Amino acid sequence: MSTTTTTRAEYGASGTSYYTTTEKQDSYPSLENILEKHCKNDTLKACIRELLDGCADITEALRSALVTVEGTDNSFGDKQLSVDVIADNIMWDLVKSSPTIAYGASEEEPVMVKCSGSDYTVCWDPLDGSSIVDNNWAVGTIVGVWPKHTGTGEDGMLGATGRDQVCSLVALYGPRTTVIITLDDGVYEFSYGCTPEGCQLPDGSFEPWICSKIKVQIKEDSKIFSPANMRAAQDTPGYKKLLDYYMDNRYTLRYTGGLVPDVYQQFTKHMGVFTNPTSKTSPAKLRLAFEAAPFGALVEAAGGKTSDGVTGGSILDVTIKEVDQRCALAIGSANEVKRFNEMIMAK
């Protein structure tokens, strides 16, 4: 267990906190050590290294860039922020120069672009959390990696599902930069920029990336909830009933409005549920290929569960029919996603 519960009844549900009990190790495995043991495909190893280099570059850029409005709109008509453009440019530079990536698409401009590499189709959200980044809150990068031969088209995307991914990766940029990745046998977390005072490799040396968590697991039950799209509760009675259940049963609210921090916490607290149903007046906003499928692969690899919010089935089984396809989503601890299905869809 890496978290503990402290309850102060006089403060009500908000007085229930989940603190880490993770103790500092004398040394930590290197990125190369973990990849060598837990990623058999050499081409995929190279792709992961490239993606982590991109996350490192975005980290450094966020530390120095001001958050300002650019003079451009993205494909959805939203004003782009300086940090959105910087992060997306870093990802495009990486993807277009990669020997492993054959096709790429960004959430900022959801059109598949042919690249010069060999094996993979990569979709990414360069900086998830644009609406909260000006607050200096945690934001992130989401990446899904598909073989280029999946699906029905030459780019490997249309006709594919999230279950076809060979790797997914989410970076969280907060006081520290950490990245969770699906490898052959589970989910691993890597931390960036460790110092001699922080952590070191077994041989006493220091590298940009060390493995800070091995084979992360998400428990079946949770007392933490992250309710997105609460407007949907106005015309979705089941969602209002679910929110009332959380409050009546003294669940702890942990919600920032950013998909990355709100779901990533499930890998540090080892529990949680993120709910984002849709309704006629509150339509789907999450993007299947850029957000839901990559996170779904990570959560299910860690023992969690997902729901597509329509059939109650896994988000990983939804066929990608459009690059910019939107979807509902419930994701997290298995029994909590089951509760979502039961209350929202009577499944």
Q: What is each stretch, according to the model?
A:
Residues D73-G77:
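Short, surface-exposed loop/turn segments at secondary-structure junctions
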Residues S2-V69, K79, V85-K347:
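IMPase-like, lithium-sensitive Mg2+-dependent phosphomonoesterase catalytic core
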